[in-house]
Amino acid sequence: MNISITRFLLLTLSLAIVSCSSATDDLDPTKNWSASKIYTEAKAQMLDGNYEQAAKLYESLQTRYPYGIYSQQAELEQIYSYYKQGEKASAISEADRFIKAHPSHPGVDYAYYMKGLANFDDDLGLFGVYSQSDLAQRDSKPYRDAFETFKELVTRFPKSKYTPDAVVRMRYIVNALAKGDVITARYYYKRQAYLAAVDRAKEVLSQYPKSPQVEEAIYIMAKSYQAMHLTKLSEDAFRVLNRDFPNSRFLKNKPSINTPWWKKIL
């Protein structure tokens, strides 16, 4: 009796699974589509700005036809669809997966570029970096990750069509990070945390020696040493400032570090 009941239940479950599978297939209009047709439709959705629908089609293509040129191209375009949806983590993950699986693919430079772009928080903009509100706690890791990815792209693919833009973004990142450190150093100085101000200013000199922010970083060091009554170090810093930036506005006008940054340059 128990065996019969068990067989009956298993049969019922099997029928239910088949039924559900059939129902799911009936709801999928792409079930009989070729790889070419799915890709073409996904591309059309992408061009129309329907990135979520395009992503679903690319996923379907990769699941059904995991091998061949359409699948690999779908992987690349999937990165872009995630990026345009604002799913930056997914875009980065997809780019990493493509780079690892297809290191010699002709389009791998695009994967590097999109990974860098996803990390490069384009919505933050310059004024996000200038803001003092939470700069001391701001996470700069995405910027640094973007820089390293763009650097790898530029190094490995110097002739890539994405390299010129990557170089521009790398320069932006360096200046943005340097500005962030200078603002943080100024923040520490205002709160009489002079040693912390010196340490942050030194980071600008060591990490971003060619950035325009070096000038103010040296000035903050000089003023911080002065506030700590470290006369020799303060004089040395002012001497370096005078040598490297003889026309420095900090030497001419001696603006207060407590003066808002925008008043110093306007």
Q: What are the functions of these language-model segments?
A:
Residues 16, 20-266:
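Acidic, polar-rich low-complexity tracts and alpha-helical solenoid repeat scaffolds
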Residues 9-17:
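Bacterial N-terminal signal peptides
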